[in-house]
A protein has these predicted regions:
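Residue-level detector of conserved, function-critical positions
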Residues: 1-99
Length: 99
């Protein structure tokens, strides 16, 4: 996993799994995800083994893949569902769920 000139990687699929490439086609994150979305506010939403989490541009899992659903970041927060409870998570992984 490498960061090429600070470029934002884009998702691609190979053999039914998703990873990320830089703008010239170099693999930045190997294909291991079941689903992968574009980067939003520096993080990308990915699904691994049926659970959602977030990676940074170097492919580091900064928010563990543990959510039932997750949306892109907007205004520093992402909407998530965990064990049937709705809430939001910040970029540090701090999660607030409805009671």
């Amino acid at each position: 996993m490498k960061d090429v000139l600070g470029a934002t990687p884009v998702p691609y699929m190979k053999n039914g799994k998703f990873g990320y490439k830089d703008k010239v086609g170099n693999v930045v994150v190997e294909c291991k995800y079941d689903a992968a979305y574009k980067f939003s506010e520096g993080l990308a939403c990915v699904r691994l083994n049926g659970k959602w989490g977030f990676i940074d541009k170097l492919g580091r899992e900064v928010i563990k893949c543990k959510y039932d659903t997750a949306n892109d970041f907007s205004g520093g927060l992402a909407r998530v569902v965990f064990n049937g409870k709705h809430g939001v998570v910040d970029k540090f992984g701090n999660c607030t769920l409805d009671k």
